[in-house]
Structures are given as C-alpha cells and as structure tokens.
Curated annotation (Swiss-Prot):
<dbReference type="Pfam" id="PF00412">
    <property type="entry name" value="LIM"/>
</dbReference>
<keyword id="KW-0440">LIM domain</keyword>
<dbReference type="InterPro" id="IPR022087">
    <property type="entry name" value="DA1-like_dom"/>
</dbReference>
<dbReference type="GO" id="GO:0043130">
    <property type="term" value="F:ubiquitin binding"/>
</dbReference>
<dbReference type="InterPro" id="IPR045218">
    <property type="entry name" value="DA1-like"/>
</dbReference>
<dbReference type="Pfam" id="PF12315">
    <property type="entry name" value="DA1-like"/>
</dbReference>
<keyword id="KW-0677">Repeat</keyword>
<keyword id="KW-0862">Zinc</keyword>
<feature type="region of interest" description="Disordered">
    <location>
        <begin position="447"/>
        <end position="474"/>
    </location>
</feature>
<dbReference type="GO" id="GO:0008233">
    <property type="term" value="F:peptidase activity"/>
</dbReference>
<protein>
    <recommendedName>
        <fullName>Protein DA1-related 2</fullName>
    </recommendedName>
</protein>
<dbReference type="GO" id="GO:0010088">
    <property type="term" value="P:phloem development"/>
</dbReference>
<keyword id="KW-0832">Ubl conjugation</keyword>
<feature type="region of interest" description="Disordered">
    <location>
        <begin position="60"/>
        <end position="108"/>
    </location>
</feature>
<feature type="domain" description="UIM 1">
    <location>
        <begin position="99"/>
        <end position="118"/>
    </location>
</feature>
<dbReference type="GO" id="GO:0046872">
    <property type="term" value="F:metal ion binding"/>
</dbReference>
<keyword id="KW-0479">Metal-binding</keyword>
C-alpha cells in the first residue's frame, strides 16, 4: 500500500442498521363480552329454565289449597352489590303452591344477582333480545328483574396519537415503531420524505429511513469509481483514505493501474482525466495549472529562491546552474553521483558535485489529447567550477513543489560551499528539509489574509517570492497544495528526511537557525 494512504474498516452495524416494522395490527375493539361469556350465560339460563319447568310440574301435581300468601319481592342492597330476599313467612301460613312460587322467585333473583357481580366494564351483545333476561309469565314478579349494567366507556380502546400528523389514529391499520404509532401514510423516510411501505427499514436514533436512502447517507462511496465501497470477507467495509486529502477509494484501485498524480498523490477519478507526461507520469488538473515544464520557465523561480536565501543572510556566492530534466536523465545522474542520500522511490531533485553530461528540457511540451507532447531536449556538459556542479529538478511539477525542491537542493549547495563536510544523512537531509519547509511556509503566509497564522520556525519569513507577486498572488487551490507539501515534509516516515527534519526543526525553533548551523559546523549534530 502507498505510504501516504491509510486503511480503515467499519462495521455495517455502526453505520447501517435494519429494523423491522414493530407491528401492523387490526383495530382493537374493547367493551364486548366474548363468545365464551355469552355461552356461559346461556347455559346457566337453560339450566334455570329446566329447573323451573320441573318445579311447575311438581307444583301442579301436589299443589296446596291455593290460600293467599303474602309475597315479599327481593330487595337490592346497593352497598353490598348483591340481591337477597326478605325472611319468608312461617311455613304454617302458606300453601305448597305459594312456597314453590316464592322459591322460584328466590332462585331467579339469586341468578340475576350473580350476573350483577360481573367485573365492572363488561356488557352484553344484543341479538334481537333473544338473550335478554325477561320475567316469566305465570306469577313471576316483574319487580324482581334487575337489568344488566351498561358497558363502561373507560374500557374502550386506548387512544393512539399519530407521531406524524399528531392526530388520533382511530380505527384501522396502524404502525408502531420505538413506542410511537403512525398512520401508514404518515410513516415517512427522514431523508426523501416519501412513505415507507417496505417490510424492512433503517433507523438512526428514532428517525426512520428507506434502506436505500440510509445507505446513500451512511455507506461510503469510492471517489474513484463512485460505487459503494464493497465489504470484505469479514463483512466489514474496507477502504483506503489519503491522510491529507481524505480521498476514500476501494482497495482494488491500488493495483488496477488507476493513475495517481505524481505531485499531490491523488488517484484519478473515472469522470476526470489526468494529463500524461512523456516519461509516463500522470498530473492532475489542479497541479497542471501551475506546472513548470522547461528550464527557461523555471529561471525566475530559481532566482527568487536565491533571493530568499540572501534575505536570511545565507547568500550563495557561486552561480550554480539549474536544469529541468526528465525522469530518465535524473536517474542516470543519480547513478553517476557519488555523494548524496536518496531514499525516495522517485527522486525529484539532485545537487551534483561531479562533472556529467545531462540532457535538459529546453522547450516546454504542448498539450494534446490529455498528453504533453513535442518536448525538445538538449544534452549539456556540466563542468565543475566549485564544490557544486549543478542543481537538477524533475520537470512538469507544480510551482510550489518545484520551489520546495529547489530550496532543498540549494541548501545542499550552501552547506558544501560553506565547508560543511561529512555530515550524516539525518543531519544534512534534515536541515535541508527545514529550509524547504520554511520557504513553503513563507509562500503560504505571503497572502495578507493568512499572515496571522502561526509559524513553526523562529526565523523571519519576510522575503516573499517576487515571481508569485508578478502573477497576482496564489489561488486557494495552490495554497492547498502548499499545505499538502508541508504536510509531506512534516510527516515523512523515513529516518533521514522525516526524522532528520523533525530533529532539525526542533533545534531551529529552540535555538534559531543560525545557532543551529554553527553547532552543526562544530559537532556535526543538532543541539539538544
């Protein structure tokens, strides 16, 4: 994996959840006695009528004299919720028929009293009064009939308020979710606003979503192919993310020949084409805006950086040639160079101290079908007139990156011209990276709107690039690129470039650049 990329995994359960509809229910009807209660009442009534018929038969066969008997109708005692008769008269004063009649009244009264003990809130289902208890003809006292209670309204269905329209749901189907009820048409997706009619939906807190809407909101998409990033074998969403640009992409794009910008390291999106240089490198559109592609075009920037050194009292007395070269020419020069430390897979700059013949880019290429073509080169013999033969920089890089490379290589030249010998790579590369970082910082801070930003160096950055000022300042895109190049220097993982920069920058911030350089001259190390 690329050193500037990072891997991240997330479980779908943390960003994508599926919940089922709690229930879909038919309307609940309260306040009716079920069929079991009705059948029990009918059975009791049938048994009572059967007993009464037997009683009448026995009375007609063995009836008394028919003497008049005082009959006391049953009374209802409201406090006790029961029915009981008054004490009967002496048996000696009544005939057998009168006694039987009184027994019948007592039995019916007790049966009706039993019905009055039903739990409060129950009623009866009426069907043309077939089940309505009524007094019997043949002497049954109508005053003994006690009508049933009316249904209690407090046991009707519980009122449900719709969580969508805040009105009563009433009868009909309804949905329940997280303790809240909805009309079916009021249960809507929090993202698109349309009703959720599927059996499954997604929840984020208490907010419902269509599954697809929730996936669009939470499931990461690849910024290269613009598809949802797939899950791996463990069911986790695995993707790569650039540490500075936060560009998320599928892991497969690291080995499927997707183009990567040689300057900012961003991958080429499928809907935006990169430019291809003649040596095979790719350049994004933003980096292409300020790319420097030939030696003549780079001369103003080179002299501006020399002026920057002079402004810090580090003037380079020798005129060191500077050439923009192709990748192949730079690699060949590295092979012939005895001095120097190079850790990067692709070296983008070199400070020569040996005599060599180098092919430089004399005329910039022209644009054609997303390619730079028609570049003119020229071999050039470099002779050694001092400790430094020449400075070589890779062509086709944006202005700020080209300047950062020049500032780094010029520091190598300054060290050699000022008698710094046999420095270990961590010290030499580290202090050169500090000068590169300082120049980038001065370029980013040169805009008046950002002058209040803190500086990581104690050295004043009053010398700004006149080359940039002639162009009317830098765009926000170029400033963002400058921040990225600073980020690259500060977070380099190599011991010489990254570790050396952090040690050198700490010393320069604590003691100042001049005292740090004096200590390096005497001891070959950074001051602690």
């Amino acid at each position: 994996m690329d050193s500037s990329s990072s891997s991240s995994s997330s479980s779908p359960s943390s960003s994508y959840g599926v919940a089922r509809v709690s229930h879909i229910s038919n309307p609940c009807i309260f306040g009716e006695v079920g069929s079991s209660s009705s059948s029990t009442y009918r059975d009791k009534k049938w048994k009572l009528m059967k007993w009464v018929s037997k009683l009448f038969k026995s009375g007609s066969n063995g009836g008394g004299s028919g003497a008049h008997t005082n009959h006391h109708p049953p009374q209802f005692q409201e406090d006790e919720n029961m029915v009981f008769p008054l004490p009967p008269s002496s048996l000696d004063d009544r005939s057998r028929g009168a006694r039987d009649k009184e027994e019948l009244d007592r039995s019916i009264s007790l049966s009706l009293a039993d019905n009055t003990k039903r739990p409060h809130g129950y009623g009866w289902s009426m069907d043309n009064n077939r089940d309505f208890p009524r007094p019997f003809h043949g002497g049954l006292n109508p005053s003994s009939f006690i009508p049933p209670y009316e249904p209690s309204y407090q046991y009707r269905r519980r009122q449900r308020i719709c969580g969508g329209c805040n009105s009563d749901i009433g009868s009909g189907n309804y949905l329940g979710c997280m303790g809240t009820f909805f009309h079916p048409e009021c249960f809507r997706c929090h993202s698109c606003g349309y009703a959720i009619t599927e059996h499954e939906f997604s929840l984020s807190g208490t907010k419902p979503y269509h599954k697809l809407c929730f996936k669009e909101l939470t499931h990461p998409k690849c910024e290269v192919c613009h598809h949802f990033i797939p899950t791996n074998d463990a069911g986790l969403i695995e993707y790569r993310c650039h540490p500075f640009w936060n560009q998320k992409y599928c892991p497969s794009h690291e080995y499927d020949k997707t183009a990567r910008c040689c300057s900012c390291e961003r991958l080429e999106s499928w809907d935006v084409r990169y430019y291809t240089l003649e040596d095979g490198r790719s350049l994004c559109l933003e980096c292409m805006e300020t790319a420097i592609t030939d030696t003549g075009e780079c001369q103003p920037l080179y002299h501006a950086i020399r002026d920057y050194y002079e402004g810090m009292y580090m003037k380079l007395d020798q005129q060191i040639p500077m050439l923009l070269v192709q990748r192949e020419a730079l690699n060949d020069a590295i092979v012939g160079e005895k001095n120097g430390y190079h850790h990067m897979p692709e070296t983008r700059g070199l400070c020569l101290s040996e005599e060599q013949t180098v092919t430089s880019v004399l005329r910039r290429p022209r644009l054609g079908a997303h390619r730079l073509v028609g570049m003119r080169t020229q071999p050039q013999r470099l002779t050694r007139k001092c400790e430094v033969t020449a400075i070589l920089v890779l062509y086709g890089l944006p202005r700020l990156l080209t300047g950062a490379i020049l500032a780094h290589e010029l520091m190598h030249g300054w060290l050699r011209l000022n008698g710094f010998r046999n420095l270990n790579p961590e010290v030499e590369e580290g202090i050169c990276q500090v000068l590169s970082y300082m120049w980038l910082e001065s370029e980013v801070l040169s805009d008046p709107s950002t002058r209040n930003l803190p500086s990581t160096s104690s050295v004043a950055t009053s010398s700004s690039s006149s080359f940039s000022n002639k162009k009317g300042g830098k765009s926000n895109v170029e400033k963002k690129l400058g921040e990225f190049f600073k980020h690259q220097i500060a977070h380099d993982a190599s011991p010489a470039y990254g570790g050396g920069f952090r040690a050198a920058n700490a010393a320069a911030c604590k003691y100042g650049l001049r005292r740090t350089l004096d200590h390096i001259r005497l001891t070959g190390t950074f001051p602690l």
